[in-house]
Amino acid sequence: MSMSHLYGRRGDEEEEDGVEIEKFEVSEWDLANEFNPDRRRYRQTKEEATYGIWAEQDSDDERPSFGGKRAKDYSTPVSFVSAGLRKTAAEEKAEREGSDDSDAEEAPPPPRAAAPKKLQTGGSFKTSQRFAGGIRTGQDLGNWEKHTRGIGQKLLQKMGYVPGKGLGKNAQGIVNPIEAKLRKGKGAVGAYGSERTQQSLQDFPVVDSEEEEEEEFQKELGQWRKEPGTAKKKPKYSYRTVDDLKAHGTRANMSMSRPAGELAQVKVIDMTGREQKVYNSYSHMSQKHSVPEEAPLSVSTREQKSSGFALPELEHNLKLLIELTEQDILQSARLLQHEKDTVVTLTHESDALQVRLAEEEETLGRLEQVMSLVERFEAGDKEGDPALSLQECAKIFEQLQTEFYQEYKTMGLGDLAVSVVHPLLKEKLRNWDPLKDCSDGLEEVGQWRAILESTLSLHSGPDTTNMDPYHRLIWEVWVPVMRTCVSQWQPRNVGPMVDCVECWAPVLPLWILDHVLEQLIFPRLQREVDNWNPLTDTVPIHSWIHPWLPLMQTRLEPLYAPIRSKLAHALQRWHPSDSSARLILQPWRDVFTPGAWEAFMVKNIVPKLALCLGELVVNPHQQLLDPFNWVMDWECMLSVSSMVGLLDKNFFPKWLQVLCSWLSNNPNYEEITKWYLGWKGLLSENLLSHPLVKEKLNEALDIMNRAVASGLGGYMQPGARENIAYLIQTERRKDFQCELQPERREVDNSATRPPGMAAVPASVPTNFKDLVQAKAEENGIVFMPLVAKRHMGKQLFTFGRIVIYIERGVVFVQGEKTWVPTSLQSLIDMAK
């Protein structure tokens, strides 16, 4: 058994192979003390000088001490030198790495304990001899502990010692002390058998010598191949399977076949690892995790490797054989993969051909059924066979559409209707008169629309090269019959033609309906309008033009200009007493545009009405109202502004002049009141609500008020002044109520409005006067102007019992001597 574990030293081979070997080569300590005069010298004995290396050596003479040679005392027990606590290989390696920096700066001479055990002096040996000789087993060893207080154990516990565990930071010390076994006699070591204790057997189990020899033999077996001075290294074998070789070949092919793009030569810096790496392209970066290839050895490496054993020719041949074998494997793998791909491709093609063959067989079967149905159309053309009716043809087409829709669309079977259905439908419509029986044949044509017309051609135009079958049917069969009928039709006989077009409109394509209205009917209407004379024709033009409005709408606008021109020419010698003009023009009011209608009336009617009002004679004693009534009959035909303009220029000046003359000749104010109210009653509410008409009527009231106040005309009937004042007050109150009626209506609406909805004012005050009027209404205060009462040209108003006037948005209240400005709230408080 090796004792190197007691000395605490292990060599490199011990660390590598686990074998404990004591090295005897020249160490650093030997080199440092080679020229040291104080180092301990070893004297050669006579026997060593005589026999040399064959001299018998005594273990006691290896390292003599300075005390001289003394006799051996074999009665003393064996003393061992403690090597301290052994550390694990990882701890020793970490300790050596940590101490490399400090040792590199300064290397002090090794202490005495660092020298090899065989070169140490005998001081320690003497001490052990004295220690061994001074102690006698069997005596009262440690009796002095009985008289102490156990201070040592207490100190150890303070420093963290736990009884039953080893000393040290990690409790790496031994728990039980080293056991010593007393030798039976005075013989040498091993003379009395094994001297190992039970503790030694547990800590260092016995290893079979044969196993040690076998291990040593295996270790030294291959030493002849190694270079001298090199440590044993286990051979490293690299295995490459066929799958690895295929994968490597696939990646190589992919990298070679990858096209060089714009970013092929971009420099990429990879900082994802511990160290910064630079790649020449993104493809290199994508391969950073792939299995690296075995790089070729450098020249120095090959020389160093081949110094012990080198056969370059053999290595070249082996490498060449390996490469050829790899190429054969890759080529075979490629051929195998190609054959597999070919098999898969052929399998897919075979399956596709089988599917296509089945589809073709099914298509052939369907085509045979289609041919059998189409041949039924030809059966009716043969001699001796009855011709097919429209109903039978419709059933065949419906069967083709429902059961063979794909073939119907791809082969254009709908075009068969041109040769099959057209003759049958022409025969049915040959004797048809649209003006007598407009619904004849409508059901059959509607049935064929559902069969032949496609949704894509609903809004298509007339394209003779690619026309829908149904559109072609209508265009070639129905339109010629309709064209013949329209050419013989009288536009004034509007009813039958309008009924016919309205009846057939749902089944006609849009472009065909437009063609009938624009190309067939409109030219006939235009020709008839050109021949129309409003002075001689007894039938009004609107009676045969207006029925076309729902169908033609804006298409009739080109006819309106000639109609207005003819009507204007007919009104040149017209007088308002002739009411026929109003009957002719009234149906056209909603047909013409508002601008065109207003221009026509201003140019042709208003001047005639102005002349009629000019001829009106206002005579209070014998009044003729026919001219005035003739003008008022046109109120519904004219705009309010036109009527007010007529009255302002041609009626009110004459009417006010007659009133002034009457008031200056001792009038009867009761008759004047009735006369005023009579003329006012002839005006409509729309005219009375106009500001200009209100102004003229108020002017008449002012004239009457001034006449009563000044006593103009001499004698005045009793109560005339009060009657006139009452009339004025009543008229003003009516005007005031008319102004407030929209606001009251808004108040009523707000009362019935549900809570949470904000009231929207019907009219927003536009000036300060309107605001004062609104506040007066809110507080129930009467606010009205005073007749013929002014102050410095400003109208005076009564606000309750207070007289005020308004100037520049400020209310002035009449005081004792002057007019005082006040606020609106103060005015309301004073009025209450």
Swiss-Prot record:
Keyword Oxidoreductase: no
Domain G-patch: 148-194
UniProt region (Disordered), positions on chain: 1-21, 33-145
Residue list for modification Phosphoserine: S209
Entry superkingdom: Eukaryota
GO biological process, one term: spliceosomal complex disassembly
Keyword check for Nucleus: yes
GO molecular function: nucleic acid binding
Keywords annotated in UniProt: mRNA processing, mRNA splicing, Nucleus, Phosphoprotein, Spliceosome
Bias-annotated ranges (Polar residues): 121-130
Biased segments, Basic and acidic residues type: 36-49, 88-99
InterPro entries membership: G_patch_dom, GCFC_dom, STIP/TFIP11_N, TFP11, TFP11/STIP/Ntr1
Protein family according to the UniProt entry: Belongs to the TFP11/STIP family.
Subunit structure: Identified in the spliceosome C complex.
Role, per record: Involved in pre-mRNA splicing, specifically in spliceosome disassembly during late-stage splicing events.
Protein name as catalogued: Tuftelin-interacting protein 11
Organism, scientific name: Danio rerio (Zebrafish)
Source taxonomy: Eukaryota, Metazoa, Chordata, Craniata, Vertebrata
Annotated gene: tfip11
